[in-house]
């Protein structure tokens, strides 16, 4: 068994509900030669700006999006990636994509970098930290408390509780200049604020009033955990947005508020001033 010594130590998650893919992405980059990107990548990939709320506050609604967007989004943040995935209704390519994903995982672990995978521990993202060709198993680390380590047979990758395959590996830096990363981050933030997602949930800026209604006229004691989860999830993500703009000199005084609300952000993204 080849297994990397990786933990969630040093990954900022003040609420305990940080989106598991963002948490896994930051941890993977932190445990790579490109660790300088570990905090920024949550924002520069666009995940820090994404919000959507279903009518019944279903926590699974946060996982309804195009998984194959991970590669171009992360590469927009300055890192090169490999991605292997499969959706429902693609059983005819299940084996092909699973073998591709396992190959990507092995190469990544051999480089000393964990892989990000869907359905690790619970139906959320987590890390693949190792592999064993003799037993044909993968070593895994869950992003959800109690952060259990486990093993997963090769044949079960992408075939567990929710049979979708999504494996992202980081392969290096792509040389993208920081000013271009900032400009493209602003563009992605605008798209997300405007609700540029293919799901039917309230999204972008519309997610705020949709969530607030569940604290007022739609208040229900039985939905207490759902409200806590969504607030914790998006609140933790917005920390990374704030940190990124702070580093780039746009979090002081009114500038960050303008960027957050979208008007100033649109100008910076599409006009340049």
What residue spans do the PLM features occupy?
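Cys-His-centered catalytic/binding microenvironment captured across papain-like cysteine peptidases
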Residues: 2-92, 110, 116-123, 131-273
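Mixed-charge, Lys/Arg-rich low-complexity intrinsically disordered regions
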Residues: 89-107
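Generic recognition of flexible, low-complexity loop/linker segments
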Residues: 104, 114-115
